[in-house]
């Protein structure tokens, strides 16, 4: 098991780096893409967040070699949930093409469509909604017509001719001259006749030798081509690219060919084991236009090498040879982005393929940016840098600036008013400390004299309990969250320690308060405005470690940047081993319970004269 976990961790490292050759090598070594690790997720869940072509190739490699598109994490999330929540439309389409079930729900009862809508990823939501609509339409039409299904050996492309190709996924194909593998696959279902890619030269003539292909269909299909460039490569082409064949350095474009679909000689069973039929939309009268939901791929084979007929043992020919490098792997497969395909109309060549620009943000700036958004990132390494940079970019462009700094879980609750149903998690937290083991040395002992408290700014609440009836649940929660400026753990012996500290600064000259901590300065500012501080006590009569754990979950949900707390809290017991997302959901749940306490008790302000100074 230790060896399996180690391989799975290495596989996830390769996925973070988006290195397809390393992913394939680890899969051949036996790495399990569906193995859930200690953080609650498997490699296939991490790969589902792919956005760039290299990441999509990694996801395709996992799905080809045993990756389950419906694998569950400890939170019952599937890869489709991950892709929908992160707004990764291409990864979502690829998973759907491999049999991902959009009807599965996570532990909160949410479908991928629900997550896409909550996070504002409209393209992903549209794909899932269209899929649901088409599925219901086909089911209704099928029930009305009762047409017989075509025989498995019927020539032609599979699926109805008017069905749009929503995704194209990588599928293993027989080796080419460079000992690499690539292919295409589409809608899941019984495979039909294989449709190998045909390589053409820059004049459009077929490079296949006469008699090598058996023509079996007149259907139109889209061919992805590499066109050898006659001009000198661009100045930013890497120097090592000159050693590649001319077709590797050429321009790329997608053409529409009204020609026959070739079928390689050999047994149909061998070919069907490696390729699945493509489901394509026939071109309209105005000519072919690339669909915004399709992903153009290219043939990696040399310009004059037709796909070979597979031979026994061909499944082993995709291994990484010793003389091949990752650089060759990167250049061997070139992709068109959606923007390039749409700007050229799918007909004209585009400029030379360029690598994605390397981020100029330093590690320190990246850490500061994530912490400013309420995140608590681990140390940045070459494996985590790209993931954190993507997370920072998405958070910066996410809608709802009034929720910036809060966790994604709390931001979703603030937008919708829906609170995660994690009462079972709170019960598990409380159960462990109901009768704590006296043999263990718990922090501050096992006396049940602690509680969690929130300091609120009444200038934000505006007597929220009195006017709550006129607000929606989301508005009540938003007002409550905006008012919180400190979360702490208190005891009955020291219930107002921070207010006492602020009282010591009260009345001094204005030159001195800046020496106080941010929390005290906030209290002094509230008092200076003529208001009092609201100290909300909740979750009382618990041992210290339980109060610390509740405090930590709440701080994680709120985001420390939105508070005057100077450090993150500490979790104890079973909660310490939970994934951060699970702790944040519990924090949102606890905040909602604290809101209910506040609404029930009413707003009580504490002014300087209300605090008894210590002797």
From Swiss-Prot:
Keywords assigned by UniProt? Answer: ANK repeat, Cytoplasm, DNA damage, DNA repair, Endonuclease, Hydrolase, Nuclease, Nucleus, Repeat
State the tissue distribution. Answer: Expression is predominant in adult bone marrow.
- The record places domain GIY-YIG at 448-566
CDD domains per the UniProt record, alphabetical:
GIY-YIG_COG3680_Meta (cd10454), LEM_ANKL1 (cd12943)
Enumerate the GO terms in the molecular function aspect.
Answer: DNA endonuclease activity; endonuclease activity
Question: Where found?
Answer: Cytoplasm; Nucleus
Its domain of life reads Eukaryota
The LEM domain covers which part of the protein? 355-399
Query: What PROSITE patterns does the annotation carry?
Result: ANK_REP_REGION, ANK_REPEAT, GIY_YIG, LEM
What InterPro entries has UniProt attached to this entry? ANKLE1, Ankyrin_rpt, Ankyrin_rpt-contain_sf, GIY-YIG_endonuc, LEM/LEM-like_dom_sf, LEM_dom
Residue interval(s) of motif Nuclear localization signal: 579-586
Q: Where is this region: Disordered?
A: 138-210, 283-315
Placement of sequence motif Nuclear export signal? 271-280
Q: What does this protein do?
A: Endonuclease that probably plays a role in the DNA damage response and DNA repair.
Protein name per UniProt: Ankyrin repeat and LEM domain-containing protein 1
- Native source species: Homo sapiens
Question: What's the name of its gene?
Answer: ANKLE1
């Amino acid at each position: 098991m230790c060896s399996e976990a180690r391989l799975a961790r290495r596989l996830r490292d390769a996925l973070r780096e988006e290195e397809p050759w390393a992913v394939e090598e680890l899969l051949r070594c036996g790495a399990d893409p569906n193995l859930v690790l200690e953080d609650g997720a498997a490699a296939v869940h991490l790969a589902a967040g792919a956005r760039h072509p290299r990441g999509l190739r990694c996801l395709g490699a996992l799905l080809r070699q045993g990756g389950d598109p419906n694998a569950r994490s400890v939170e019952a999330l599937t890869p489709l949930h991950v892709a929908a929540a992160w707004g990764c439309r291409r990864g979502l389409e690829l998973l759907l093409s491999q049999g991902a079930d959009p009807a599965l729900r996570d532990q909160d009862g949410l479908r991928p469509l629900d997550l896409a809508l909550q996070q504002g990823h409209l393209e992903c939501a549209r794909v899932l909604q269209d899929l649901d609509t088409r599925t219901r339409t086909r089911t209704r039409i099928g029930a009305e017509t009762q047409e017989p299904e075509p025989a498995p050996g019927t020539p032609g492309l599979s699926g109805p001719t008017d069905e749009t190709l929503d995704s194209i996924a990588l599928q293993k194909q027989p080796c080419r001259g460079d000992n690499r593998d690539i292919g295409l696959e589409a809608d899941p279902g019984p495979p039909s006749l294989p449709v190998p890619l045909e390589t053409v030269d820059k004049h459009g003539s077929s490079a296949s030798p006469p008699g090598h292909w058996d023509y079996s269909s007149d259907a139109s299909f889209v061919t992805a081509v590499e066109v050898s460039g006659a001009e000198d490569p661009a100045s930013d082409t890497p120097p090592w690219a000159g050693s590649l064949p001319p077709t590797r350095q050429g321009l790329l474009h997608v053409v529409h060919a009204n020609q026959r679909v070739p079928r390689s000689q050999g047994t149909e069973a061998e070919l069907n084991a490696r390729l699945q039929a493509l489901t394509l939309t026939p071109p309209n009268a105005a000519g072919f236009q690339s669909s915004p939901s399709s992903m153009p791929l290219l043939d990696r084979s040399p310009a004059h090498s037709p796909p070979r007929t597979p031979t026994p043992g061909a499944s082993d020919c995709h291994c990484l040879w010793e003389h091949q490098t990752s650089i060759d792997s990167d250049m061997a497969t070139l992709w068109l982005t959606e923007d390039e395909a749409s700007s050229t109309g799918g007909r004209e060549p585009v400029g030379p393929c360029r690598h994605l620009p390397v981020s100029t943000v330093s590690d320190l700036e990246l850490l500061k940016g994530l912490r400013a958004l309420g995140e608590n990132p681990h140390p940045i390494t070459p494996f985590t840098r790209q993931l954190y940079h993507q997370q920072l970019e998405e958070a910066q462009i996410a809608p709802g600036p009034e929720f910036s700094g809060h966790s994604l879980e709390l931001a979703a609750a603030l937008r919708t008013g829906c609170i995660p149903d994690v009462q079972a998690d709170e019960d598990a937290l409380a159960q462990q400390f109901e009768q704590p083991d006296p043999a263990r040395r718990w922090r501050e002992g096992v006396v049940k004299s602690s509680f969690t408290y929130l300091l609120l700014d009444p200038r934000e609440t505006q007597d929220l309990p009195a006017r709550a009836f006129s607000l929606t649940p989301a508005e009540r929660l938003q007002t409550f969250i905006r008012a919180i400026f400190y979360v702490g753990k208190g005891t009955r012996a020291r219930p107002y320690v921070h207010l006492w500290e602020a009282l010591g600064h009260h009345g001094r000259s204005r030159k001195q308060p800046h020496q106080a901590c941010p929390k005290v300065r906030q209290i002094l500012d509230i008092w200076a405005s003529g208001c009092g501080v609201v100290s909300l006590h909740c979750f009382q009569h618990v041992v210290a470690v339980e109060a610390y754990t509740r405090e930590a979950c709440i701080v994680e949900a709120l985001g420390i940047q939105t508070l005057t707390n100077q450090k993150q809290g500490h979790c104890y017991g079973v909660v310490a081993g939970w994934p951060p997302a699970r702790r944040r959901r519990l924090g949102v749940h606890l905040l909602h319970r604290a809101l209910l306490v506040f609404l029930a008790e009413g707003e009580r302000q504490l002014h300087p004269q209300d605090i008894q100074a210590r002797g």
